[in-house]
Structures are given as C-alpha cells and as structure tokens.
From Swiss-Prot:
Residues 39-112 form the S4 RNA-binding domain. This is Ribosomal large subunit pseudouridine synthase D. Belongs to the pseudouridine synthase RluA family. It is found in: Cytoplasm. Residues 8-17 have a biased composition (Acidic residues). Keywords: Cytoplasm, Isomerase, RNA-binding, rRNA processing. Its EC number is 5.4.99.23. GO terms for cellular component: cytoplasm. It comes from Neisseria meningitidis serogroup B (strain ATCC BAA-335 / MC58). Residues 1-20 are annotated as: Disordered. GO terms for molecular function: 23S rRNA pseudouridine(1911/1915/1917) synthase activity; pseudouridine synthase activity; RNA binding. Its main location: cytoplasm. The active site is at residue 160.
Length: 374
C-alpha cells in the first residue's frame, strides 16, 4: 500500500524520530546474529533497531552510547557475528520538547476519540530545530494531558507553519491507527482555499512528482526522477483582475504540495515567501492587502472529512476563512467591480460553500503533466 500524507515531511516525516512523550533513557542488550556478519556497526544496528533512524543510531555510536564487547566502537566497524552490544537509548531533542504549554487553541470539535483544531498561521505543529517550544503539540499536551500516552501525541498529519486551518488529532492509539490507515488509503478528504497570482484558466488536475529542489535543499520542487507522486485538483471559485480565488483538493500530501504545484502551473500563491512572486503586477491597494498577510501565504485548510474512528460515520468540518485572507479577497472583489456586499462569512459560504462532489477522487489520468483540464 502506498503511503501518502503520512510520509510527507510537512504532514509527517519517516526520517525523523517522532516518538511518544514517555520515552526515557534505558539500555538495550543485543547479540549480533551471524547472518549480519560483515556489516558495519551502524548498518547492523539499523536492522536490529528499526524503530530508530540510522542517523540517530550513528550519533549514539559517536557519543559513546553504544558499547561492543565492553568497548566503544565506530560506525564503520565491521561485525563478525556474536558480538555483545549494549545500546543506551537516549531521548531525542524532539522528545525532550514534549512538554505541556498552556495556549489558546481553537478547538472545532472534540470527543473521547479525536480533536479537530483550527491551527492559526504562524504556529509550528511539532517541536523541531529552531522551534523547541510554543508549538501546537505543546498546546495540545496542556489541553489534553492524556495525549502524552499516545505515540506522536496523536498527531497524524501536519500543516506548514504559515498555513492555517483544520487538523485532526487522535486521542487514543486505536483512533490514531484508524486515521493513519485512512490517510494511507487516501480516504481523508482535505480541501484548501487559496488566492493565486494571475488568472487561473480552468478547473483541472496537477499531477507530478515532488522531491527536494536539487538547487536548494530547503525547498521542494517538481522533479522528473526520485520524487513522490503528487496529485492536486484545482477548482476556480472566482477570477479577479490580477488574482484568482481557488479551491484545492489533495489526493496526496507531499511537503508544500499545493504551493509547489501552483508555482509550477505559473500561478504561485499570493504572499508565499518561498515559492511566490513578490513582483507580481497588481494595484497598490491589492499590494497592501497582500503585504498585510505578513509571512504567511494565502492558503487555508478549509474543510476536513474523515471516517470517525469510533462511530464509523463520515464526519466533516469547516473552518472560516481567516480575516487576513478574507480582507485580501474583499479588496480583490472591489477592484474587479464585483459585488462587494459579501460582508460576512455566512454570505461568503452561501456563494462559495464547498459542495459534496467527489469526482476529484477519480484517478482518470496516468501521465506526468503539470496542469490538465478535468
């Protein structure tokens, strides 16, 4: 089965040790089996301790936390079989950051099984280098202390720091397993609203491979080889003079997927600090509205649907468009001479509310393309 959202570094990273908060320092005794004779110590440990990344095991070896036959060793040391290994398991920095921090959370829904939260732009989901405190995870642990007993504190997918919107968090291990399985099977429906530069010509599907940008390892890009399949469905809600209001549905959940795909389609998201075009031509009033978004791109996880882990029923949630994006839309409508009387969220919902058309989930193309009409 192909992993989708759960293997995405933005939603979830298989390359990082994302353990539960209960992990503590302890020792593990191992005997190198004869079938692994001839292998390097780091490679042997990676096979014997698959729950830990090879990079983490290598760092333990270099730190002297791995003893082979009562002696410190090096990652490249060859094993002959039968060696006695003692590994001191040390909590990762991420794990040490699993501490509750009270913060105001916009809880959209909560029961004994799941929490649905509306994440604001600017909030990091999970502790990592440069953001060891003040993350959504820290706030969730304060709100629901029992999450400390759930692997990964119940988080099964992520949003970029500067993307706002809906996330679901599992409160129990069975619920987490259910949600992960749904993400892997692509049955979780995620709909985003965004403002894109330019006039998006038609509704369509963007289907590519996404991987690390070979010229900038801090960015993602559409690549021909070595990437992961990524599919985004785009629906145009409204067109203005210099921008378009769009709705994006995800089949997959790659890192920065919508942002990368819209850039590749020559319609990057407004105000995107990484993939956007700060010189996109537009009127002064619109420029000010875009500037007022600050560091965040005009992207919001608007709707989330999944099968409830306990009841088995399909549940759907929506989060109103944030004020900063709403202001930009109002300015764009006014400039375009459109009805500017849509003064509140209810009126916007009546005009642009999500429908229940599931046609986006039909995989009727099997080509490497950038943008095709549906």
């Amino acid at each position: 089965m192909q992993n989708t959202s759960f293997d995405n570094e933005s939603d979830y990273s298989d390359d990082s040790d994302f353990a539960s908060a209960s992990e503590t320092e302890n020792r593990i005794g191992l005997t190198v089996p004869l079938e692994l004779a001839g292998g390097r110590l780091d490679a042997v440990l990676a096979k014997l301790l698959p729950d830990y990344s090879r990079s983490r095991l290598t760092s333990w070896i270099k730190e002297g936390a791995v003893i082979v036959n009562d002696k410190p060793s090096q990652p490249k040391d060859k094993m002959i079989g039968g060696e006695q290994i003692c590994v001191t398991v040390r909590p990762s920095e991420e794990n040490l950051a699993f501490v509750p921090e009270p913060m105001a959370l916009d809880i959209v829904y909560e029961d004994d099984t799941v929490i649905v939260v509306n994440k604001p732009a600017g909030l990091v989901v999970h502790p990592a280098a440069g953001n060891w405190t003040g993350t959504l995870l820290n706030g969730l642990l304060a709100h629901c202390p029992e999450l400390s007993q759930v692997p990964r504190a119940g988080i099964v997918h992520r949003l970029d720091k500067e993307t706002s919107g809906l996330m679901v968090v599992a409160k129990t291990l069975p619920a987490q397993n259910s949600l992960v399985r749904q993400l892997q099977e692509r049955t979780v429906k995620r709909i985003y609203r965004a403002v894109a530069n330019g006039i998006v010509p038609f509704d369509g599907k963007i289907e590519t491979q996404i991987g690390r940008d070979p010229h900038n390892r801090l960015k993602m890009a559409v690549v021909k080889f070595g990437g992961k399949p990524a599919v985004t469905h785009v629906k145009v809600l409204e067109r203005y003079l210099t921008h378009s209001y769009i709705e994006c549905s995800l089949e997959t959940g790659r890192t920065h997927q919508i942002r990368v795909h819209m850039r590749e389609a020559n319609h990057p998201l407004a105000a995107d600090p990484v993939y956007g075009n700060p010189r996109h031509p537009c009127g002064d009033t619109v420029k000010e509205a875009v500037k007022s978004l600050g560091a965040r791109q005009a992207l919001h996880a608007y709707r989330l649907s999944f099968t409830h882990p306990e009841s088995g029923e399909t549940v759907s949630f929506e989060a109103p468009i944030p004020n900063d994006i709403y202001h930009l839309l109002s300015v764009l409508r006014l400039e375009a001479g459109l009805d500017s009387s849509l003064s509140n969220e209810e009126e916007w919902q009546d005009k642009f509310g999500a429908d229940d058309d599931d046609d986006w989930n039909e995989d009727d193309y099997d080509v490497e393309v950038v943008y095709v009409r549906e």
